[in-house]
């Protein structure tokens, strides 16, 4: 079984009202719900396409510079499991932030923080664990929404943004190695969930990047980071078409939804 998409969490205690966190230690969360399997292929690197090294060539554009201001960090106390998860997200509509479902699993009161350190309380209004997408409503968020583009093609040079290892903000290059369909394995039942369309990226994805956007040179969102391979510089992202479908289903939601349970 190939292991990819393993969410990582920074274990933190004592979340204060000013959202200052004392980092106690890093904890790898080996949740099988975010482990992908593709037939009997044993190597993660062979899930979609052969691995290549992450690119060093960066994409520079005014559009990407503007997009960076709409990429946020997600902080949320998962009290049942005794840790605070950190991840990334981005504004997809007025007052609506996209992130991964595993970032806010078991979190009742997420906090959104921008690169300037400003924070806003949010409410999870959409949760899809099969596609690993969640939406957070932040009505007072003064950040501009990003445009959702079309799916990237294999060989495309893209940029992914987020807050690896709990920050600071970083924008790094990636190459789309391939796009394909796979399934997640439910951690509780062992049964396969619905098919998930994903990119395989040559990218130095780290814990904390989960939920961050993958963008083209025009600053359009073409994907959402959700995991990495256990070895090498290979990351995985949800496609723009999957994100668009989720936004059509739950982008207008305003009521809080259950975030399920966190996983130790």
PLM regions and their residue ranges:
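Conserved hydrophobic positions within beta-strands
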Residues: 89-91, 122-124, 176, 214
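Short, small/polar residue-rich loop motifs at catalytic or cofactor-binding pockets
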Residues: 83-86, 106, 206-210
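Extracellular/periplasmic catalytic domains that process cell-envelope and extracellular macromolecules
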Residues: 64-67, 91, 127-129, 151-153, ...
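N-terminal activation segment of mature serine protease catalytic domains
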Residues: 5-90, 109, 248, 253-264
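Active-site region of chymotrypsin-like
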Residues: 68-75, 134-145, 170-263
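Residue-level recognition of short loop/turn positions
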Residues: 88, 94, 116, 217-218
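Conserved active-site neighborhood of the chymotrypsin/trypsin-like protease fold
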Residues: 78-83, 94-170, 254-257
């Amino acid at each position: 079984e190939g292991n990819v998409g393993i969410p990582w969490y920074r274990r933190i205690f004592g979340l204060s009202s000013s959202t200052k966190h004392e980092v106690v230690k890093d904890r790898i969360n080996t949740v099988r719900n975010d482990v992908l399997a593709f037939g009997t292929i044993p190597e993660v690197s062979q899930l979609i396409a052969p691995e290549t090294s992450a690119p060093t060539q960066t994409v520079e554009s005014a559009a990407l510079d503007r997009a960076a201001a709409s990429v946020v960090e997600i902080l949320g106390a998962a009290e049942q499991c005794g840790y605070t998860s950190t991840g990334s997200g981005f504004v997809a509509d007025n007052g609506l932030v996209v992130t991964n479902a595993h970032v806010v699993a078991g979190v009742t009161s997420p906090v959104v923080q921008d690169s300037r350190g400003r924070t806003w309380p949010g409410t999870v209004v959409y949760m899809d664990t099969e596609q690993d997408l969640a939406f957070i409503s932040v009505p007072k968020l003064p950040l501009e929404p990003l445009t959702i583009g079309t799916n990237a093609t294999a060989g495309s040079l893209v940029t992914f943004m987020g807050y690896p290892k709990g920050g600071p903000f970083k924008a790094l290059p990636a190459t789309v190695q391939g796009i394909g369909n796979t399934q997640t394995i439910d951690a509780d039942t062992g049964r396969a969930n619905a098919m998930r369309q994903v990119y395989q990226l040559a990218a130095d994805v780290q814990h904390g990047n989960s939920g961050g956007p993958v963008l083209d040179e025009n600053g359009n969102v073409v994907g959402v980071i959700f995991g990495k391979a256990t070895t090498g510089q290979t990351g995985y992202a949800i496609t723009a078409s999957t994100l668009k479908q989720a936004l059509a289903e739950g982008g207008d939601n305003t009521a809080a939804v259950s975030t399920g349970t966190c996983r130790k």
